[in-house]
Each structure stands twice: as C-alpha cells, then as structure tokens.
Amino acid sequence: MAKTKQQKSKPKKQPHQKQGKDCDLSQFRAQLDALGLKIIQVTADGNCFFRAIADQLEGNEDEHNKYRNMIVLYIVKNREMFEPFIEDDVPFEDYCKTMDDDGTWAGNMELQAASLVTRSNICIHRNMSPRWYIRNFEDTRTRMIHLSYHDGEHYNSVRSKEDACGGPARPVVIEADAKVSAASKQAKATESKSKNKADKCHVNAGAIKVVMSGSCCDNTEKAEQVLLQVNGDVDAAIEFLIADQGMESLTENDTETASASDTINPKHASDSPMENTEQAREELIEEESASGNNSETVQAKCTTQTDDKKIPRNKTCPCGSKKKYKSCCGTATGRSSVKLLVSQTMESKKGRKNLRRGTSNEVEANAPDVGALCI
C-alpha cells in the first residue's frame, strides 16, 4: 500500500512544479524584456553563480572554476573582512576549503568578494521584486555585472537583447536606476554645500565679544575673521588669537618694539581677561536663548565699531602683539595672515578642546564604501 501511494504521488508532483517554474520563468523573461534585457541560462550544477560571472566577463561559462578560485583566494587574503560573517561557527579555513570545492553553492560573501576582486558592481534581477545592487565603486565607468536570481537557488546571466553573446557582456544601462542614483548624489552634495555656507556666514555678535575679551584683542575685524575660519568656535578662536600673539612676540627683535612694550600694562593683560570673559559668556548665553541676530546686523555692528576706533599708526597695536599698529593689524598683510595661520594650527586646537570638554566629533569617513555583505 505504501509503495502504491508513493508511485501515485510522483507523477502529480513533478509536472505541477515544472509548470510553476516555467510560468515564473516566462513572467521573469517578460519583466526583463521591458528593460531591453534577456536571460542567458547557465548549467545548474552548484557552480551557477561562478558560471554566470564567467559568462558576463568572458562569454564562456566553462571558465567558472577560474573565477571560483579567484574569489576564494580573495576571501582568504582578506580574512579580517570576511571571517565575522561566516555563520554556524564554521572555522574560517574549513569554510574556504569547502567553498573552493566544485559544486559548492555561493553565498552573500562570494557576491561581495566577486565585486571587489573583479572591480565590478553587481546588479541582481529578481522576479517581480526590486533589483539588488552591490555598488562598491562610484566611478561611472565601472563595469556592471548583471545576474538573475531564481527561486533562491539558481543564478543566470543577464544581457542586452541586442547582445550576440560572442564574448563579454555588452554594457547595460537601466535609465531609471541611473537617474535615481544621480539625483541622490546631487541632493546630498547640494545639502552639504548649503549647510557649510550657512554656518560660515553667521557670526554672533556676542561670540565676537567673548573672543575679544578672552584674548585681549581689541580688533573686531580680526576676531570676526578668526571666528569665521573656525566655524564660530569661541574657544578655538580665543586659543588661536592668544597663540598668534605669543608667536609674534617671540619673533619680535627690533629695539623699537622693545621700547614700545614698556607702555603696555601687564596687569590689565593678565587680570582682566578671565573676569571679562566669564561676564561676556553669560551675556552670550542670554542672547542665544532669545531671538538670534541675523548676519547683516552683525556685519553692520562690527563695521561701526571699527570706524569709531581710529588708532594712530605709530601707537602700540591694541591686539597685544607688542608691535606698532602700522606694522601689525593696521596692514593688509596682518589682516590676511590670520587665515593662513588658522589653517595651520586649527587641528591641534580642536584636539585640545575635545580633550577638555570630553566630547567627540563626528568624523565623515572619506574612505570608499565597501558595500553590504548581507543583502
């Protein structure tokens, strides 16, 4: 009885599955046909992923073993990148040895390794589902390998309908995907540019006051210029101005400057900054809690203060540099040198500031995106 039931169930099950797969494949072909693409079937023997890669790059699926060895070797050489993604606690060496055997199915790690070792991006087409992209290279000239994925168990190669299949696959461009990618990059670039521009244009009048008090610098224009260079960071601006004054003092050798230094009141330079700075900080906090001042008001205010204070050129410069005004802040060179000095010293200043505050800055990674292993 058991044997009879088993014989009856076989003919019913097989044609039903075959009909369903044929229907899915027909639907899949129609989906790709709308994009101007066609499926190039490869042998389903456990090597299908490597066969599809070989067809895309050489036009010969029989070269599958060459690409299997190439991909496994890349995984072995980049163990620290791939080992954390091996499942079921399988030892790394055992995994690589098994993957190198003929007929072993490829997984997500092999997809990523194939993209990196062939320096190609990969597009995976799925039946009635969005396309998957493994995009490790942003250069528009990078080759795009096109594969189709069937029922979670088989890969085929995908080519343009006009491709004669006489060699490597011809380049395929899916216009909808290209437009989305370009629009996304442009939007990110525009957002970043506008944010940086807005941050640099706005300098709070209270921040200028705090910087001038903390650094004993009476030159409003110089204080504002430094604040712009450090993106409004009050502590960094104060540290820079103090360091700038110290550097100028060390390089001052002429006797004329030495005699002028006798007129400076040392007590004022050492006692008053702390008190003035604390008071100015409190005023700045109150101002920021209320409505913010716009950049035009700040510029008008700074210009008025500069015009009201006309300093004789032969007098000692009020910025505390111990030099005459005409050879310090009163010259175009003195004003323009601030920008260069800021760029040379800001990294060390920001490092000290972070240690003091106990905070960490967000770092924008410039290194290239290596894509996702788990897709």
Swiss-Prot record:
GO terms for molecular function: cysteine-type deubiquitinase activity. Residues 37-161 form the OTU domain. Optimum pH is 7. Changing residue 48 to S: Abolished cleavage activities for 'Lys-48'- and 'Lys-63'-linked ubiquitin (UB) tetramers. One of its GO terms (cellular component) is nucleus. Residues 202-250 form the UBA-like domain. The keyword Transmembrane does not apply. InterPro entries: OTU_dom (IPR003323), Papain-like_cys_pep_sf (IPR038765), Peptidase_C85-like (IPR050704), SEC_C_motif (IPR004027). One of its GO terms (biological process) is proteolysis. A motif (Nuclear localization signal) lies at residues 308-315. Residues 1-23, 251-306 are annotated as: Disordered. Hydrolase that can remove conjugated ubiquitin from proteins in vitro and may therefore play an important regulatory role at the level of protein turnover by preventing degradation. Cysteine protease with a preference for 'Lys-63' over 'Lys-48' over 'Met-1' -linked ubiquitin (UB) tetramers as substrates. Also cleaves RUB-GST fusion. This is OVARIAN TUMOR DOMAIN-containing deubiquitinating enzyme 7. The gene is OTU7.
